[in-house]
Regions:
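Zinc-dependent metallohydrolase catalytic domains
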Residues: 1-133
Length: 133
């Protein structure tokens, strides 16, 4: 995987062995957030599709969609190519676009929330998805 800002350059992609520990942490963290939200719904006798109101705001998004959109917002960033290349070499975290997209694409509820279908750029075959715990 090569960050989009570095596509077409000679920069090597993400070193999966170098980022493995942080990738596991990200996947575990988002997975726990999904489990916690499901428990909240269950404990309160709710279904996700009923959760159209958020505080005083009406929302066009379901709770699961908001959960994944909040996850995505955390990883918004912009970097110059030089900085992106430097971070690839020294940072044990995957680039933010992968921390966002690849982690979410390994969570089954993401597919349900956004009706992601095979052929989408976000699709990972179920047997190839990674689960933690």
């Amino acid at each position: 995987l090569v960050p989009s800002v570095l596509e077409g350059t000679k920069t090597k992609g993400v070193n999966g062995e170098f980022t493995l520990g942080e990738n596991i942490g990200d996947l575990g963290g988002l997975g726990i957030a999904v489990v916690a939200y499901k428990k909240y719904l269950e404990d309160n006798g709710l279904e996700d599709v009923e959760r159209q109101k958020f505080g005083d705001l009406n929302s066009e998004y379901t709770g699961f969609q908001r959960l994944f959109l909040a996850w995505a917002r955390v990883w918004r960033s912009k970097a110059r190519p030089e900085m992106a290349a430097q971070l690839l070499a020294i940072d044990p975290h995957a680039p933010n676009e992968f921390r966002c997209n690849v982690i979410a694409a390994n969570i089954a509820e993401f597919y349900e929330a956004f009706e992601v279908e095979q052929g989408s750029t976000m699709w990972i075959d179920p047997e190839d998805r990674v689960t933690i715990w």
